[in-house]
């Protein structure tokens, strides 16, 4: 999404988005703002949260992006929200609960420990903010690989196979569905990327100027990161080929009720090692 947006926006829109984006820079607690070395391999954690007023929420979507501008390679790892992990105090819990326990820092620390990686940068969006952002750009079009139905307290919808137009709430359901997908969490990862790319296309389009004020407001109220807009622009430029050929990594495993009476997803040791090795190889190439 960064690549499409930054490379194609007009000069005026670029400056306006830069002004807005640099207003929600939020460094990690206990960490000084580190300049991003765009020509070095880097990990960035994307976190989608379900924050509400008086409720810290949980991490509804967690994706680790790894870039190597020298080799023009990039990987993405979508981490199942119900995956059992061990947090800093030794307690076992679902990885999506880490955000409620200690915010972005706890989630990043847990992912670092679980996958043996260093994650200096993050971007966080409130999932309701993603809904608002899709609506702000006038909806998105995606190519749905398989028909499915979605039913929760806010939306009941049948998603047809093929190209479909979605509003914000529909795009959220499309990006979140996992259980009916024959590819499981990998399928959800693909659909999440589709939605982000579709939003990026809209942000890069000619109509961005007419919606700029609304888009800026949505981002200001729902988005935070410790990467400046200029750094993101450089990162996008140096990693464009990697973005275009992004390799998704997959965690296989099984889910069941553990001894504490809670249902968890348990990643297989083999898929954990394969993911760790793929990221390590990319970072050291």
Model-predicted regions and their roles:
Residues 1, 8-285:
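Non-catalytic, solvent-exposed segments at the cell envelope interface
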């Amino acid at each position: 999404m960064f690549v499409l947006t930054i490379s194609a926006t007009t000069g005026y829109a670029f400056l306006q988005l830069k002004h807005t984006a640099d207003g929600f820079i939020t460094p990690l607690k206990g960490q000084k703002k580190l300049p991003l070395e765009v020509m070095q391999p880097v990990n960035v954690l994307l976190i989608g949260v379900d924050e509400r007023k008086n409720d810290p929420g949980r991490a509804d979507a967690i994706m680790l992006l790894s870039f190597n501008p020298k080799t023009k390679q990039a990987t993405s790892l979508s981490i199942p929200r119900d995956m059992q992990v061990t947090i800093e105090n030794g307690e076992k819990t679902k990885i999506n609960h880490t955000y409620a326990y200690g915010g972005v820092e706890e989630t990043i620390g847990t992912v670092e420990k679980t996958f043996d990686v260093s994650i200096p940068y993050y971007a966080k969006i409130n999932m309701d903010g993603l809904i608002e952002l899709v609506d702000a750009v006038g909806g998105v079009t995606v190519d749905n690989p398989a028909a499915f139905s979605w039913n929760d307290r806010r939306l009941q919808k049948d998603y047809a196979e093929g190209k479909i137009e979605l509003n914000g709430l529909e795009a959220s359901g499309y990006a979140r569905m996992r259980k009916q997908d024959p590819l499981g969490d990998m399928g959800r990862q693909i659909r999440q990327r589709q939605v982000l790319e579709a939003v990026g296309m809209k942000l890069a389009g000619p109509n961005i100027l007419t919606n700029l004020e609304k888009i800026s407001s949505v981002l200001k109220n729902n988005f935070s990161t410790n990467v400046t807009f200029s750094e993101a622009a450089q990162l996008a430029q140096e990693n464009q080929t990697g973005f275009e050929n992004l390799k998704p990594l997959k965690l296989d495993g099984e889910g069941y009720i553990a001894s504490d009476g809670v249902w968890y997803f348990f990643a297989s040791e083999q898929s954990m090692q394969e993911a760790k090795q793929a990221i390590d190889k990319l970072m050291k190439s």
